Every structure is written in structure tokens, then in C-alpha cells.
Amino acid sequence: MKHRRYLIWMLIFLLLHAPAAHAGQTAVTGPVTGSVQGEGPLTVTDFFGRTLTLERPANRFACLYAFTGHVVTLLGRGKDMVAVVDGLKKDRLIQQRVPGIQSLPIPAKGGVIHIETLLKADPDVVFLKPETAAAEAETRKLERFGLPWFVAGYRNMDEQMTTIEMMGKICGRYDAARAYTGYYRDMIHLVKQRTRKIPEDQRVRLYHSVNEARRTDAAGTIEADWTRAAGVVNVSVGNRLSARGDKFFAGMEQILIWNPEVIIVNEAGVDQQILQDKKWAAVTAVQEKKVFPIPVGISRWGHPGSLETPLAILWTARKVYPALFSDIDLEMEIKQFYHQFFDLVLTDEMVQNILNNEGMRQAMDAR
């Protein structure tokens, strides 16, 4: 099956001028459905290299990292979440897919686990982000009460896919996880094939704004990895940045020296902030009005905790190298992606809202 997908991807690449092609047509079959797979014991390895053994696939999930709630939903088990973090309740498509999410308890905030709330939720497994799992005081709470926990972390796309597949085993939905990672790998292959002949000195120089105008990507992160896969030169990667915890910031003088040709931003309104700020006026991307908001669906595409990174790769490559991707119907690709992996049927209006980063995340005080 994998070989067959590869051959069809190659055919798509050769038929660049075929009308209305879409990048994932061979991977997209239908929405994730089906029952929990496997009844016996299972063993997985998490991001910290810990081995977790369960007697059977879990049925009650505490998702103390928003990414893991997205994965559980992707695997068709969103209704089995019993505890979440606040950020998951902001995502409108998650609200649509998991209608009861607003009533779920929030047993962790700011990396601190409120064990009484978590115990009342009675999870079979607790999914943690690495920062929380690194705090011994927090994991001791879980160990004291015998709660199994899994660290969902990654620094690049391969590690992210491995984490998703391990979670697929925990959820009893390994086949669904493999369907998603197969699509992910196929998209990387497609885009790399189409951009591989562009000389390094002719690749578009891109700056990626993360939440704030001057927050950006460092080397050794998944953002550095996926922007490389999109065929661009990410100007901040490998250069000196100011670190604040796990966040990285560029100085304005450095951005002017980099002089990116394209800027992509993942926070609504930051594109206009950059375009209107006189300090950015000398940047080529600003002068040529090539400052674009990144689409937002289940989450911000290409954000560290995003499951839409395959779409972010395609969208970015198509935005900066339109002639190489003119045959791909991006709107259809988006509809098929969300239908297969989240069982969502998107209207044309919803697709445009995703592409324009409009109204897809709910303000916390609006609930």
C-alpha cells in the first residue's frame, strides 16, 4: 500500500499541469471510524524514553497538553477525554467535534497539576507535555496515586509522528494513527519533490512570526523542520536569538539584516501590526506586501502543537512557489483532510475562515 501511494504521488508530480489536482488524493479515503483495537497488554516508549505498559488500550484520557487532546480527537476518541487543559476549549472545530468539551474539568494550569481534580476525573492514562513531566514535584503526584502517564514531546516531524503512533497504540487506534502519519510523510515527499531543484541561493527567504511579531523559530525545533520541508530558507534558524524559557525572539536590527522576502504570522492581527509598524518598513516582505496570516483550523497550522503541519507545508510552499503548485486545489485538500482525520464536513465559508485565520479560536472570556 505504501509503495502504491508513492507511485501515485510521483504521478501527481509529473502531471503538474493537470487541472484541479489535490495533494492528498491517494491518502484520503474516509473519516476515522471503527472500534478500539486490541484487548491485551501494550507497551510504548514516550519522549523521555520511559516505557509505559498498560493491560489494555485506555478508555479514559486526561489530556494535560492541548496537542494530546487534538491527537485523541484525531484518533476518533475525543468523547473519551475526561480532563483537558483550558486551551483545548478555545478551538472551535474541537468544540464542534467534541460537543461536551466545555464541561470537562481542567486539572492543570501553568504546569501545575491539581491532583484532587484529576483523581475525580478517574483517567486510565494522563498525557503530559515535556515541561510538566520534567517537574519532579508534578510527576510525584501521579506516581503517588498510581496514575499511568505518557510524555508527548518532539523536536521535529519524525518525533512528532512517532509520538502520535505511540498514542495510537494507547488509544487502541494504531491504524488511524498510521493513516495520519502516512499522509504526513506523503505530503513532505510531494513538496520536497517539487522544490528539490531550486538552488539554495534562489529559495525564498522567509521569516516566521510565532504569536508575537518578533518571536520566531530556533534551530532544533519542529518549526525549523517543517519550514525546511516547505522549500524555503527560514532566516532565523541557526542565527542568534534571545531565549525566554522555550520561546525565542529576534532583535529588530537582526530582522532588518535578514531582510526576508516573505513573512508568515500565526496570530491574528500580527500581519497588520507588522505592515503598519514603521520599524518594519524597510523589510522587503513589507514593501512588497508579502506578509501573510497562517491558516488556523483545529489549531494554528505549523505551530509546535499543531496536527495541521502537513497542510502548513503545502500552504507555505504553494504561497511562495505558486507555479510549482498551481494544479493543486488547496480548498479541496483542506476539506478532505478535515473530513478524513476529524470527521468534519466543512462549508466553503469555513474553509475561507481557516485560510484567513478568522474566528477559528474562541477568546477565553467569550465562553
Language model region names:
Residues 1-8:
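Bacterial N-terminal signal peptides that target proteins for export
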Residues 63-121, 125-133, 232-235, 243:
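A short, structured surface patch at a secondary-structure boundary
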Residues 9-18:
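Bacterial N-terminal signal peptides
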Residues 62-64, 82-85, 125-129, 149-153, ...:
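Structural recognition of the beta-strand scaffold that forms the well-ordered cores
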Residues 32-36, 41, 51, 136-215, ...:
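Extracytoplasmic substrate-binding proteins
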Residues 239-293:
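A contiguous binding-surface segment within folded domains or other stable secondary-structure elements
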Residues 220-246:
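Alpha-helical, coiled-coil/dimerization segments enriched in small aliphatic residues
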Residues 21-23:
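Boundary at the C-terminal end of the N-terminal hydrophobic targeting segment
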